[in-house]
């Protein structure tokens, strides 16, 4: 079994049922870390609210959800303070508190998402609140 699984290299969470199945899979396979980026803030927030109302943990520890921001005009509704992934547009400067995705600054393109997983950094480090991606 893989130790890390990334959902949606291209795509997003479809609906609440789909997201609940993502949660169930993470609960059923605790030895694997699952992660995704999403712009489906309402779906995620609604499911978290329902889970909290049912006295359940908001999300399994092995399911990492990163809300995708897209500049000043597209801000995530983030009442549960989930971590975020933000675009740094050309000509803009990355805020110092944001972590730059290592894959984007690796000139030889040898660094991959799994490397961050293996090193416990980037998207897999809960202390890092915002991941920066350069516009491409």
Regions found by a protein language model. Name each.
Residues 1-136:
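Class I S-adenosyl-L-methionine
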